[in-house]
Amino acid sequence: GRDWRHPHAPNNGDWGGNARPQYDPPEESYKYGAAHDLQIYVEFMKNQITELLTNYGPIGAIWLDGISTPLSRPEKVHQFRAQELYDHIHSLQPQVLVSYKQGLLGTEDFKAPERHFKGTSDVPLEICDTLQPYSWGHDRSNEGAHKSADQVMEMLDHAADLKANLLLNTGPLPDGSIHPEDVKTLAEVGKRFR
């Protein structure tokens, strides 16, 4: 995912309205116009991945997020230097599988689209979904609307039909605990597999 706090992260002026949260007033540390240099952020991102791959033992996969930003400006996608990053990852740990959501360059080892995927894939799939509707993090407005065990079973069936893994997210509460609705749902799904 993006580090929205980094002053040179993709900005809304260059990369569209979804690149960063639209704070009012705008975040003072964000760089715009001639002051913005995406390459500083790209190097920061590479250094973060280097830290993960050199300080924490063997890693199975790197799952890059935020694909809508580079895809919003196809003529500028090369500025993200994605293939260089993929090659760097494999130079540090050759076994690492690399994914950038549904695929940015077509050289990813697997695809990880959100929620729904139609069609076929020439690489393995991992479908990503949430127990809260519309949110990857805790959102109080979703109280009482979390997904049921039946809905999770439907997601599992959809993933199985695609021969895909299901990555199922629960947004933790502010204290780090799992929402009681999600605990109940996951316990019920677990019972169905016993």
What residue spans do the PLM features occupy?
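Mature catalytic domains of secreted/periplasmic carbohydrate-active enzymes
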Residues: G1-R194
